[in-house]
Amino acid sequence: MLTINLPKTFKVKYLLIALALFYLILVLLLPAIAVFYEAFHKGVEPFIQAMGDRNFQSALQLTVVMALISVPLNTVFGLCAAWVLARNQFPGRALFLSVLDLPFSISPVVAGLMIVLLYGKNGWIGSWFASWDIQIIFSVPGMAIATIFVTLPFVAREVIPVLEELGPEQEEAARTLGAKDWQIFWRVTLPNIRWGLLYGVLLTNARAMGEFGAVAVVSGSILGKTSTLPIFVEQEYKNYQTEAAFGAAVVLALLAVVTLVLKEILEQRTGHHKAV
């Protein structure tokens, strides 16, 4: 007769839980606590002063601009790509999916170098812009291109499985009833994919605001001009302006917390709708 040593099983279970919690505390929680401590251990006033710095405000504004540019563009692209890939089988589909995932696998620094080679003054495309006295690299357009590159797959990758699970039956039924394509999208497709879409938009926004590597390569990292919040943190820390650096890091951390809360809410809503 098979017997189970329950006390031993429980010991292993709680040992694994303790190890996992210890690892999470050591790798994630303690560094976050350290950042908040360094930002506020002298009181709130240094933090407020850091937030009033013109370079910080410029970095915050530029970070928001990067998100405002990249999120709508990649949302539209992601919806189109997701619909094409979920609703059609065609030669090269696997290649399309592989290229779509490229920003996940390639180093952001390498991505930045690719953009510099292409859009620099001597690049294939950048030389044409240079002839019109338009600067791409070391300016806002280059930073926007880099941000768009690294955030490209998120919406598509969240919407594709939702569309595949949904199937084309409802859309085809609406079409047989005389609905036009735009009516089908707004009244049938979009309501069914809205939570997956919002989840993808949320991830895109979080990555856009937190991106460092690719943007640092193409921006030139000029304080007050081409410095986003992550770049501002790195520059101020290197310049021994620790209060400003940790203050900006706290802002980024708070944005991450808000993202996590919204992510959890969307996951619960998505799970609820799947269950229904």
From Swiss-Prot:
Superkingdom classification of source: Bacteria
Family the entry assigns: Belongs to the binding-protein-dependent transport system permease family. CysTW subfamily.
Lineage: Bacteria, Bacillati, Cyanobacteriota, Cyanophyceae, Synechococcales
Organism field: Synechocystis sp. (strain ATCC 27184 / PCC 6803 / Kazusa)
Function, as annotated: Part of the ABC transporter complex CysAWTP (TC 3.A.1.6.1) involved in sulfate/thiosulfate import. Probably responsible for the translocation of the substrate across the membrane.
InterPro entries for this protein: CysW_permease, MetI-like, MetI-like_sf, Sulph_transpt2
Transmembrane segments: 16-36, 64-84, 99-119, 136-156, 212-232, 242-262
Listed GO MF terms: ABC-type sulfate transporter activity
Main location: membrane
Membrane topology: Multi-pass membrane protein
Compartmental location: Cell inner membrane
Domain ABC transmembrane type-1: 60-267
One GO CC term on file: plasma membrane
Entry keyword set: Cell inner membrane, Cell membrane, Membrane, Sulfate transport, Transmembrane, Transmembrane helix, Transport
Subunit structure: The complex is composed of two ATP-binding proteins (CysA), two transmembrane proteins (CysT and CysW) and a solute-binding protein (CysP).
Name used for this protein in its record: Sulfate transport system permease protein CysW
Signal peptide: none
